[in-house]
């Protein structure tokens, strides 16, 4: 997800997005551990999306 799209969301929407991303990350890690994950780049992509959302939440809390 693009940072520009995330900046337009409210804090509640960002928290919901963070929860969805963390669930997706968990599912991807389980697939990777069991050898079922074919697209390993998704782990890195989701990890960075989580970081983007957490960064924006921190910025909005300070503002």
From Swiss-Prot:
Entry's Gene Ontology molecular function annotations: structural constituent of ribosome
GO biological process, one term: translation
Family of this protein: Belongs to the universal ribosomal protein uL29 family.
Name of the protein described by the UniProt record: Large ribosomal subunit protein uL29
Keyword annotations from UniProtKB, A to Z: Ribonucleoprotein, Ribosomal protein
Gene name of the record: rpmC
An annotated GO cellular component: cytosolic large ribosomal subunit
Coiled-coil annotated spans: none
Species of the source: Klebsiella pneumoniae subsp. pneumoniae (strain ATCC 700721 / MGH 78578)
Cysteines joined through disulfide linkages: none
InterPro entries: Ribosomal_protein_uL29 (IPR050063), Ribosomal_uL29 (IPR001854), Ribosomal_uL29_CS (IPR018254), Ribosomal_uL29_sf (IPR036049)
Superkingdom per UniProt: Bacteria
């Amino acid at each position: 997800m693009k940072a520009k799209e995330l900046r337009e969301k409210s804090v509640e929407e960002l928290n919901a997005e963070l929860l969805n991303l963390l669930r997706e990350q968990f599912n991807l890690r389980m697939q990777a551990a069991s050898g079922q994950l074919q697209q390993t780049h998704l782990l890195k992509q989701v990890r960075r999306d989580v970081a983007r959302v957490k960064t924006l939440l921190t910025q909005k809390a300070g503002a």
